[in-house]
Amino acid sequence: MADTKYIFVTGGVSSSLGKGIIAASLAKLLQARGFKATIQKLDPYINVDPGTLNPYEHGECYVTEDGAETDLDLGHYERFLNVNTSQANNVTTGRIYQSVIEKERRGEFLGKTVQVVPHITNEIKERIQILGKNGDYDIVITEIGGTVGDIESLPYIEAVRQLKWELGDDNALVIHLTLVPYLSAAGELKTKPTQHSVKTLMESGIKADILVCRTEHELSDDIRRKLAIFCNVRQEAVIQSIDARTIYDVPNMMLKEGLDKVTLKKLALPDDSTPNLDRWNQFLQRHKNPKAEVHIGLIGKYVELQDSYKSILESFIHAGAENEVSVNVEYIHSEFINDSTIHNKISHLDGVLVAPGFGERGIEGKIDAVRYARENDLPFLGICLGMQMAVIEFSRNVLQLKGANSTEMDADTKHPVIDLMEAQKEVTHKGGTMRLGAWDCELSKDSIIHAVYGVDKIKERHRHRYEYNNKYKEQLENAGMLSTGINPETGLVEIIELKDHPWFVGVQYHPEYKSTVASPHPLFVSFVKAAHEHSVKQKNAKMAQK
């Protein structure tokens, strides 16, 4: 293809309708037809990135291969497409304004008065087209965060209006995702909110090319015709998005509705192939028809909001399908774990995952959970802070290093088995300054982790400031906590495992960021397999007792 095509996805009526899933589903269908597609998210908040946002505010912060701290929607994009994203795939208002102000300070605007139009909108247009100009993609899908009519989104909507005009009708289209609510008292679907949302979009100079209508009930032909007439779109471009059992059903739903066909027609692209979703559907078949189930406890500090651990939860879905088991995740708040509660909260589980996080709140509960898993041969996976808690627990209770801790929690600890990385000691700013992105790790042969990956060297994504303190490495290894993954450049210990335990692994990196439908992460696959084996063993033991 000579020119990259652009698709813009806007939202109306309500937030949380699933623009990211619709964008990812359309991209999947286009990819399955042989097109090279990528997805970009424009976020209208003033933070430069979500790296400093509380998970309760914004869900998880997703880290890309190049070290960008981004919106969790980029996780959906990668999981659907099995293609890496980068900093260019996530733009915030804060980053836009930061760039424009820096240009003004350098004198690049030659004394002009810097304004939202044209300077901010030009910067937005430039960021939108970065991915399309490198020749890697046939189609770039850009999701506009927020809801049409929000004051924060106005510069983005104006930039899209200008760009659509500049590119021409055959090179750009707008998909508007909206809500068609069902009023149970009246027993009918109501189209008026969608009509008003489309009108608001048109007041900004944009005519939607395709309507995707989120609904709890089927849209009748009469409803579709009504929406087509009053929203000024073709009836074939009124697409139904009914509530699904799983987000992974949505690509097939959009295929059935013909979203990809309408898109190709409007972009003057050839519609001469059928999307090949065989591999996707094999995953769905295994996911929906498990042969067994396991119960895994997720020990965390932000469990009230499941989006805080979105990539972990999706990784369990991928690993469960690979093992043909259903993974039932039980959310356990680490603040509520202590000596009197731990047996009731954990004893029935088939595995324990101690989740990432920051700060001292709930730390002792995580350490107690690690100890229970270690002493009871329960499959254990510690991620980032979870690995650090495993080192602290082992140091306290096996090495008998009283008060062993991380300097993040106790700056004056006598035994800093986890310490601030040397490169972080002069850092004062919080945003974008951690050890981020993909780093090499060499694996020890004859280890659990080497068997998991089946290779000698891996590259995984990181997001942390604190590290395993190598001063305690010899003591820990002599007592049975092995260092089986080492960064070749720094000597940083990135993986630990226990010598005399069925399956006990801690990793400093975030494996959940690299699990996709097409490539479930081997660490999660192995962990779920170990949990299933533990479940079978426990059931057999109970049967023997009878």
Curated annotation (Swiss-Prot):
Gene: pyrG
Class in the EC hierarchy, top level: ligase
Record-given protein name: CTP synthase
GO biological process entries: 'de novo' CTP biosynthetic process; pyrimidine nucleobase biosynthetic process
Associated pathway: Pyrimidine metabolism; CTP biosynthesis via de novo pathway; CTP from UDP: step 2/2
Recorded family membership: Belongs to the CTP synthase family.
Subunit description: Homotetramer.
Additional observations: CTPSs have evolved a hybrid strategy for distinguishing between UTP and CTP. The overlapping regions of the product feedback inhibitory and substrate sites recognize a common feature in both compounds, the triphosphate moiety. To differentiate isosteric substrate and product pyrimidine rings, an additional pocket far from the expected kinase/ligase catalytic site, specifically recognizes the cytosine and ribose portions of the product inhibitor.
Molecular-function GO terms, alphabetical: ATP binding; CTP synthase activity; glutaminase activity; identical protein binding; metal ion binding
Keywords, ordered alphabetically: ATP-binding, Glutamine amidotransferase, Ligase, Magnesium, Metal-binding, Nucleotide-binding, Pyrimidine biosynthesis
Organism phylogeny: Bacteria, Pseudomonadati, Bacteroidota, Flavobacteriia, Flavobacteriales
Glutamine amidotransferase type-1 domain residues: 295-537
Active site, per annotation: C384 (nucleophile), H510, E512
Protein residues bound to ATP: S16, L17, G18, K19, G20, I21, D73
Annotated CTP binding sites: S15, D150, I151, E152, K190, T191, K192, P193, T194, Q195, K226
Amino acids binding L-glutamine: Y56, G357, L385, G386, M387, Q388, E408, R465
